[in-house]
Design a protein with these regions (language model features):
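Structural signature of tandem-repeat unit edges
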Residues: 40, 44-47, 61-78, 87-104, ...
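Sec-dependent signal peptide cleavage junction
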Residues: 20-34
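Core beta-strand segments of extracellular beta-sandwich domains
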Residues: 81-84, 192, 345-350
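Bacterial N-terminal signal peptides
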Residues: 12-22
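Bacterial N-terminal signal peptides that target proteins for export
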Residues: 1-13
Length: 412
């Protein structure tokens, strides 16, 4: 269903298989060929070429609050592998000081995200690589989020602003009790949160985009708050979010991927005047969109929209280009003088792939604003009118990229 989840599952199976083989995990770390039982644990012996250590593969005891041992049979326990998720009694895990990062053991802690009953993770204070806060596992510097327990009872999670990366092994997938999620402003894209109980999510504008399938099948999600700054929404981001009935897309958004709002409760959608492309979208959604977004059909029959820029030259047929090819816009003249009560139309020169074209850019892809509405009025088509004596500056912006130029207007 979700490509990223499928990849993660395949990787998990490959890792589990690697535990039972003699094939090197990398060219530095080698695994033993059999599991060893020590009390309630099973483990394999691995070596980084200098020292040997234990990698736990299962726990068969009945403890609900599990303390990972520092050593087994004289070997430091440095990692945990697949197998722990089969024990449905574990509610809390305390990682010892010896649990090491993947760069040292080439073993991540993905298994923590597979334990359905896990409510809390704690870490020994003298562990050099990890720390936990409120039951959530982070890197020692708190820049990476590794695991949010599947059965953690808290309804609200405000991700620390220090977090720059969420590890891509199901850290926020299939959460049972979380309702309100606020993401860190320092993430580059949203993490995978699909199949979770989330009802509300806040996405700070500093985040570049919403990644593929990020909230897929979050069927209780009914409120999405996105602040200005988001640039893209990738394929199937909100697929199967059936409770989502409305969403306000921010200015500055540039692209919307395939099936982003498929099978949601959204019936109407307003597209901001910065979007350059909408890939395949649910036909049942009524769009309110900028006129420069033109409708096209693929060979498969699927409908998509793409920004087009029209250049008109006197005595010649209008020519249309992909708006993405516009590299610069400039004024025909940067200074205009008009009489009070009179009007004139601003004209915009345009560079396509860095080459200046003859003619002027159609105003439908431009936005016009005035610095003084009492002196100069400007229409959506670029017609200015002098209202009273004075000066004003009209700013002309290319909607799709934000490129601008200014015209100084004097009214006599």
């Amino acid at each position: 269903m979700v490509r990223k989840r499928m990849v993660s599952t395949v990787m998990s199976l490959m890792m589990a298989a690697a535990v039972l083989t003699t094939v090197p995990v990398t060219n530095n770390v080698k695994a033993a060929d059999k599991e060893i039982t020590s009390g309630d644990y099973t483990y394999v012996k691995e070596s980084n070429g200098k020292t040997s250590y234990a990698v736990l593969t299962s726990y068969k005891g009945s403890e609900t609050n599990l303390v990972i041992p520092e050593e087994l049979d004289g070997l430091q326990v440095k990692a945990i592998s697949q197998g722990f998720e089969k024990n449905l009694k574990i509610k809390s895990i305390i990682l010892s000081k010896n649990i090491a990062p993947a760069k040292e053991t080439h073993r991540d802690l993905e298994v923590l995200n597979e334990i359905e009953t896990l409510e809390e993770i704690r870490v020994a204070k003298d562990n050099l690589s990890y720390q936990a806060q409120d039951g959530v596992l982070y890197s020692k510097d708190k820049k990476q989020l590794f695991s949010y327990p599947k059965s953690k009872k808290s309804e609200t999670y405000n991700m620390p602003a220090s977090v720059k990366k969420v590890e891509e092994f199901n850290a926020l997938i299939n959460l049972k009790y979380l309702k309100n999620l606020t993401l860190s402003k320092n993430l580059s894209v949203t993490p995978s949160c699909n199949d979770s109980s989330i009802e509300s999510v806040t996405i700070p504008g500093q985040i570049g985009g919403i990644d593929e399938s990020s909230f897929e099948n979050c069927n209780k999600l009914n409120k999405v708050t996105i602040t200005k700054g988001l640039r893209f929404i990738n394929d199937y981001a909100f697929f199967e979010c059936k409770a989502l009935k409305e969403i306000k897309l921010p200015e500055g958004l540039q692209s919307i991927g395939v099936g982003v709002f498929y099978r949601t409760g959204i019936k109407q959608l307003t597209i901001p005047g910065s979007v350059v492309k909408i890939d395949v979208i649910d036909k049942s959604i009524k769009l309110s969109k900028p006129s420069y977004l033109k409708k096209f059909k693929r060979d498969s029959g699927a409908i998509y929209y793409e920004a087009r820029a029209t250049i008109k030259a006197s005595g010649k047929k209008a020519v249309t280009y992909k708006a993405s090819r516009i590299t610069k816009i400039k004024a025909k003249t940067s200074k205009v003088t008009i009489q009070k009560g009179k009007t004139t139309k601003l004209q915009t020169r345009v560079y396509i792939s860095k080459k200046l074209k003859k003619g002027y850019l159609d105003s439908e892809i431009l936005k016009f604003t005035t610095s003084n509405k009492k002196v100069v009025k400007v229409s959506s088509k670029g017609t200015i009118k002098g209202l009273k004596k004075g000066k004003a500056t009209v700013t002309v912006k290319l909607r799709t990229t934000g490129k601008t130029y200014k015209v100084n207007v004097k009214v006599k």
